[in-house]
Amino acid sequence: MAELISLQRVVSDGYHNAFTDMTRWNGHYYLCYRVAQSHGIEPPGDVIILRSTDLTQWQQVARFDTGGDDRDPKLLHAGDLLAVTFGTWVPRWRTAGSRTDVTHDLLSHISISRDGTSWSTPRQIYGVNYWLWRLVAADGAYWCAAYHFGRRDDRDMRTVHLLRSEDLLDWRL
């Protein structure tokens, strides 16, 4: 059975900081999370990446704000690069942008770094309403389970697709 050895608060700023992921790459620990006013789909929701060598002192190395509700970041380290993927809820085109209804679409984004401090501008990957959840490197390629939905509230019509990429940017079934 696992035993908790220590517990340390990394961020305490009064915001809703959640949906974390963590990895170790090139001698540093990386922690990413979403920061927002609340749990709900209420822009702004930004993705933050922190870096540490000792798990005690943390430095912010990236903050992503695509204009929508950015959330659920996931880190991937593969050789000489570190990537973060995240989903962004955006008001559906030509709607009033109400945050209380289901007129939002989901875009998956990726940002890549070769040094852990300089990150590319987030780029949309794959199609609208496909959430690329957790990327893995295996067999000389990148793989991802992506779930798809036409509308956010239509849970009965969700499907899952296995996607493959050679470069993290172009994904195929």
Q: Where do the protein language model's features map onto the residues?
A:
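Beta-rich carbohydrate-recognition and catalytic domains
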Residues: 1-18, 23-70, 76-173
